Amino acid sequence: MLFRSAELIPINGEYKTSVIYHPMDGRIPRREGFLDFHAKRRASGLKDTDGPEGQNLSGRCLMFGAAVPSLTPGMMNPNLQIVQTKDHIMVLTEMIHDARIIRINENHLPFNIPQWMGDSVASWEGDTLVVHSINFRPEQSSSRTITLSDEFELTERYTLVSDDEILYEFTVVDNKAYEQPFSGHRILTRNRPEERVYEYACHEGNYSLPGILAGARRLESENNN
């Protein structure tokens, strides 16, 4: 099944002004003073241009957007391809070609094995697929979308509400990064049968990262002369 994740579509007959419905003001309740992985790195004296590790994940062709790409609507390449087997569900994001593997009716992995997009397990509650994810890699924290700590916990609910629509709901709990849990929802709309997910060949055309680092080394060399 191929779904588009960036449509502005009414939920229960209403066009929403925010994906967030709890808290009621529609805002993410960020905790003032919280330092995530990247902020701690900068506070220690490291610069974003010291090495590739300081650059954002999309610039390194690793991931794009939030801890789980389906959390935030994409501005481009917003397609999600959902593949289901008896024991697993795979959600492929077209942007940077992220493939998220979700195990059905399994236990979480040991906490000392952090995962890109978290360790995700799922179960069915009637016709709703409930996905619980923990143990995200700290590098996935993003000040532009979803900030996270080692306590970040995500619960998602996927409910088919028509032949062509999935109601997608999520709740984030992270007492270090946020003042309180927050929840959001939106509609995923099925694409036309002829639509396809295309390969996102990021590394092959990624000239920006070596250029950024080379420019930083050039400036350092000039300043030392």
Predicted regions and their residues:
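PEST-like low-complexity, intrinsically disordered acidic/proline/serine-rich tracts
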Residues: 1-225
